[in-house]
Amino acid sequence: MFNFFKKIVNKIKGEEVKEKKRESVPKEELEEILIGFDIQYDLIESLLKHLGDLITPKQLEVALLRFVRGESYYDKTRLKTITTKPLVHLIVGVNGAGKTTTIAKLAKLSLKQHKKALLGAGDTFRAAAVKQLQLWGEKLNVQVISAKEGSDPSSLAYNTIESAIAKNIDEVFIDTAGRLHNQTNLKNELSKIAHTCSKVLKDAPFYKFLILDGTQGSSGLTQAKIFHETLALDGVIMTKLDGTSKGGAILSVLYELKLPILYLGMGEKEDDLIAFDEERFIEDLVDAVFVEQ
């Protein structure tokens, strides 16, 4: 399967390779291609139902743009603006999705904007997660608030935000646990952390971002729904997209959850985070569909 995310990276690096494109594709074949990109079948049907038996690149592009800009999605898939200081980001997701690395990338973005950042090692039951965040903190020269292994993560969140207030920090990024094998405990823990954040911020708003492993495709939606039901998420960051052809899951997130896709993780370095551009995404998806095999 053509990896159109690699194409996005190549474009950014100025290494784009020109490929021959087909002028049209039969609808049945197009459905198979889009399924291969891990787009849900009911969404595919919705996109193509008003199109003929032969579909051109322009027709598919228009259908995709109508989808992402339609009334039911457009307003709901914009990130709300929060001006509170410190601006707190509660970062959630299953273990292995790339939460800790993504937090480092977000902190790097904050530093690039000449803001002061602070990290909270809230996955207190995993010493490796705390250590990894501390290493990133050292590399970025950003303080990491941590606690003894097994400490209450809500207390850690409280202490992190209190420290940020005292130090006039601009942005706070708090890591969390992601042990989905025990859903009830995890949901209770995350709810408690969110409540604590609200309390210390005196009910001022804060962000709740989900880190979703892009290699899992649409199967990651089940995880996403659990986190969204628990926290009322504000946005999604898709990771590990430099090595997958399952980018259609981005459309499935918009379709199922009506949440904004904020960034795409394209590697392990702190700069490998690309702001999601829906027009570029659609353009590259359409190019990938119509490339001659």
Swiss-Prot record:
Its main location: membrane. PROSITE patterns: SRP54. Its EC number is 3.6.5.4. GO terms for cellular component: cytoplasm; plasma membrane. It catalyses: GTP + H2O = GDP + phosphate + H(+). It is found in: Cell inner membrane; Cytoplasm. InterPro entries: P-loop_NTPase, SR_rcpt_FtsY, SRP54_GTPase_dom, SRP54_N_sf. It holds the Pfam family SRP54. Keywords: Cell inner membrane, Cell membrane, Cytoplasm, GTP-binding, Hydrolase, Membrane, Nucleotide-binding, Receptor. GO terms for biological process: SRP-dependent cotranslational protein targeting to membrane. It is a peripheral membrane protein. GTP binds at residues 93-100, 175-179, 239-242. One of its GO terms (molecular function) is GTP binding. Part of the signal recognition particle protein translocation system, which is composed of SRP and FtsY. SRP is a ribonucleoprotein composed of Ffh and a 4.5S RNA molecule. Involved in targeting and insertion of nascent membrane proteins into the cytoplasmic membrane. Acts as a receptor for the complex formed by the signal recognition particle (SRP) and the ribosome-nascent chain (RNC). Interaction with SRP-RNC leads to the transfer of the RNC complex to the Sec translocase for insertion into the membrane, the hydrolysis of GTP by both Ffh and FtsY, and the dissociation of the SRP-FtsY complex into the individual components. Belongs to the GTP-binding SRP family. FtsY subfamily. This is Signal recognition particle receptor FtsY. It comes from Helicobacter pylori (strain J99 / ATCC 700824).
